[in-house]
Amino acid sequence: MIYVDEPGYIIDKMTRNSLYFNHPFKDEIIGDIASIKKTTFAHLKACHDLFYHPSNMILVVVGKMDVYIVFSEIKRNQSQKQFKESILIKYLDFKEKREVKEEYSETSIDKSYNLVSVAFKMEPLDDYKGIERSKIEKTYDILLSMLFGGSSLHNKKMLENKVYNDYGGYEYSNFHQMFYISVSNYNVFDIDKYVKDIKDIASDPEKYLLDEKFFEIQKKGLMSSFINEFNNLTNLSLEISTLLADNNNFFDQLEIIKSITYNDIIKCAEEFKKAKITISVVKGNKND
């Protein structure tokens, strides 16, 4: 098993299990020997038929081409295949609690470094759709960059105080009945100081936002990252298809970023303060 003993996988699994009671996000993603052995042909066939059904696919073709020739060839190819009727995709019916399942979890590994993840269980964004939802997501992109990015007060403080020796990172995931933010570092020397600083920021994020000038810098950084997607056809096609699946238009995104104001950042910061927190720690017990 190439994943079971991998530190990053271990802390990710701990975080998911600590955040959620019932959401399938907490379930095993990669699997272990025991769970894989239970997989049957019927399971694989059901997944294949759903995943590759035309009603569940978005095809994005990027590059210089004759659009009509390309799509004619696609239609010809697909018409030769036999598909069942359109498969209706249903969300699992479950209720997720507002609280986190565990506020703290810890384990140890045979490594010489400590991994720490501080995760925030947010209110899901299910009530927001299209452009409105995309704007909220991008506002959080900027907010998190201001609070925990490479140029943030947090990162400078952690490096100066030798809490860690290299910048870690942050991420967020937003799906049906699920929205969480995670700040993590995989080489923490002082776990208590690292966790305390993140919790202090979460309790009063406005204090750490610096000013509107810093906001404009981070906003331009997000715009630059978006424009850079055009330089990589693989990333571009992935971004377009992901947005289409969420009923969003890729070509609206730049204007959405431009429309974000400092007041939008403050609103998201207020929501961030309401999050429920869980801390996951993987301690290294090996000395170099």
Predicted feature residues:
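Short, charged, amphipathic alpha-helices and their helix-cap/turn boundaries
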Residues: 36-40
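M16 family metallopeptidases and their MPP-like homologs
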Residues: 10-34, 56-62, 117-125, 155-207, ...
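Short amphipathic C-terminal alpha-helix that caps PH/PH-like domains
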Residues: 74-78, 143, 194-202
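Low-complexity, intrinsically disordered Gly/Pro/Thr-rich segments
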Residues: 261-270
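Active/ligand-binding-proximal structured segments within catalytic/core domains
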Residues: 15, 118, 130-148, 158
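Active-site-adjacent, His/Asp/Glu-enriched structural segments that form or flank metal-binding
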Residues: 1-6, 50, 193, 200
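An aromatic/glycine/proline-enriched structural segment found at the starts
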Residues: 21, 29, 34, 53, ...
